[in-house]
């Protein structure tokens, strides 16, 4: 998401009038933190003989689990198969029930009652879900592994600065007929499994898709969100809809619109793994774009499960909105911190994800980000988890976090592990100017040299840089936000007379110079 360089409100940044010792909401969250659960068994734990359901909701009056044959009301006999009351362990705040029998691929929700209000919710810890993510699914993950998955390995680099990253979207990667991908797989996970694709499918034409990436020589692809998101109706054709996916619904389930059958929760899991496997077979690592800083709606599964706990709340009862997406999550609250750690390590271990790009990382706190780093470091006995990449958008943003919280923004980056990086907007703008305006910079007119030098050195200058070491600096000229590099050059050099579909040789040269700066700078290109 776009950088919004605004002053934060946490810790020392708040005004005296805003420094209320503890708000009612912060006291409420702190009290719930006393019941924080450390177990690793939240969600549905499946066996052929029985399935145990566990959900953390210490202040709920009652919780029931509802079992369904299908993932939505629009499929066959959509009525509930059964509903069972769950029991509360007051020492852990966890509600649980074990249901005998084989519930494989059955769907479920929870009915959670707070006071006199009961809301139905999916499971925040669900690892599989039905169409549009409205119901969770009981899954045996071992049945979702593609052939050869046991032999699939992480693609890692010894040093972070050895990485080279190319950003892609699952849909954009192959949605055009010109991609040469079969019609059935265009815009889907399985497009990555097709080999020998060329422009328009013409023999001898330029390579496309994974074959193109191999020729490009990149070490990693940073894939825009492919967890389950809410802005696309999975029951409809993906080619008729479009969204990047920065609107999370189910963090631990793959997005269904990218699968060949979004109504079957197990299908999206297997096909997502096939995508990752195909990239690994090509020698390319996968960096997952994760968006833990907000959810698609404020009436999320988190809010329905434990109201006003998982989010930063203003004193008037509204949601903090530093993200610009209407609800900032509260990474400083122990159970959302745990959730982020559990979610990242789950994707790394189950899906063999090789790196994580944290959207609006500056909204998360330093302790949580360092804890995620430690959890990844300890993920494997051979220590290879320490090579899983971590970086994010460390913009300084206004959010109403608990007093004393230190946010993972650029100004606090030196408090993060040296193996947590941040995007360098300074060199980005020094190369070609601001992301959307018509202003010029180094490649157009030779200006902004001081900022460029700092960026080339990986922001590690002791007086002006914000990084401990160059490996914390992600060097780039453009990304999915705002104008692409060439369009920026057209607008800044030729203004209103510029033709965006025309090839200007001087702009091509500027584009090449931009790439040369990124590739030869210290840091992660």
Task: Map each language-model feature to its residues.
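The feature marks proteins involved in alpha-glucan
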Residues: 18-48, 81, 89-196
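Structural beta-strand segments of beta-rich domains
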Residues: 49-53
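Short proline/glycine-enriched turn/loop motifs at strand-loop junctions of beta-rich domains
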Residues: 56-62, 481
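Beta-strand signatures of extracellular beta-sandwich domains
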Residues: 64-66, 111
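Conserved alpha/beta catalytic core and glycan-binding cleft of carbohydrate-active enzymes
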Residues: 139, 373-376, 385-525
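Substrate-binding/active-site clefts of carbohydrate-active enzymes
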Residues: 171-351, 360-361, 365-381, 401
């Amino acid at each position: 998401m776009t950088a919004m360089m605004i002053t934060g409100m946490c810790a020392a940044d708040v005004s005296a009038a805003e420094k209320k010792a503890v708000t009612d909401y912060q006291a409420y969250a702190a009290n719930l933190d006393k019941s924080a659960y450390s177990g690793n068994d939240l969600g549905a734990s499946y066996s052929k003989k029985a399935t145990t359901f566990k959900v953390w909701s210490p202040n709920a009056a009652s919780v029931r689990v509802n079992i369904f044959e299908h993932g939505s009301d629009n499929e066959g006999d959509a009525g509930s198969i059964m509903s069972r009351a769950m029991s509360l362990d007051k020492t852990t705040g966890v509600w649980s029930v074990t249901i005998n029998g084989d519930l494989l691929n059955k769907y479920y929700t929870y009915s959670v009652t707070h006071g006199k209000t009961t809301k139905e919710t999916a499971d925040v810890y669900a690892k599989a879900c039905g169409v549009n993510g409205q119901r969770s699914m009981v899954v045996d993950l071992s049945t979702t592994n593609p052939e050869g998955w046991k032999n699939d390995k992480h693609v890692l680099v010894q040093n972070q600065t050895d990485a080279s990253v190319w950003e892609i979207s699952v849909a954009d990667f192959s949605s055009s007929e010109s991609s040469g991908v079969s019609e059935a797989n265009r815009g889907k996970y399985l497009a990555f499994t097709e080999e020998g694709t060329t422009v328009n499918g013409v023999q001898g034409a330029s390579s496309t898709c994974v074959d193109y990436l191999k020729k490009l020589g990149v070490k990693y692809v940073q894939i825009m969100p492919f967890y389950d998101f809410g802005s696309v109706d999975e029951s409809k054709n993906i080619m008729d809809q479009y969204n990047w996916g920065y609107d999370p619904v189910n963090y631990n389930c793959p997005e269904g619109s990218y699968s060949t059958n979004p109504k079957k929760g197990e299908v999206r899991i297997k096909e997502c793994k096939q995508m990752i496997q195909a990239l690994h077979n090509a020698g390319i690592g996968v960096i997952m774009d994760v968006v833990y800083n907000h959810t698609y709606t404020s009436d999320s599964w988190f809010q329905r499960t434990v109201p006003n706990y998982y989010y930063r709340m203003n004193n008037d009862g509204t949601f903090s909105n530093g993200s610009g997406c209407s609800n900032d999550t509260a990474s400083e609250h122990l159970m959302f911190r745990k959730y982020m750690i559990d979610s990242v390590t789950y994707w790394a271990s189950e899906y063999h994800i090789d790196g994580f790009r944290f959207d609006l990382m500056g909204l998360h706190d330093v302790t949580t980000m360092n804890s995620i780093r430690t959890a990844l470091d300890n993920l494997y006995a051979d220590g290879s988890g320490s090579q899983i990449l971590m970086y994010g958008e460390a913009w300084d943003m206004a959010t109403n976090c608990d007093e004393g919280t230190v946010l993972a923004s650029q100004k606090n980056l030196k408090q993060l592990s040296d193996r947590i990086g941040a995007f360098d907007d300074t060199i980005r703008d020094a190369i070609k100017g601001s992301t959307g305006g018509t202003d010029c910079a180094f490649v157009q007119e030779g200006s902004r040299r001081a900022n460029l030098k700092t960026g080339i050195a990986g922001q590690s200058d002791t007086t002006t840089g914000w990084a401990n070491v160059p490996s914390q600096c992600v060097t780039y000229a453009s990304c999915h936000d705002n104008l692409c590099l060439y369009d920026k050059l057209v607008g800044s050099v030729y203004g209103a007379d510029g033709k965006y579909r025309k090839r200007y040789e001087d702009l091509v040269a500027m584009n090449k110079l931009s790439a040369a700066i990124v590739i030869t700078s210290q840091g992660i290109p």
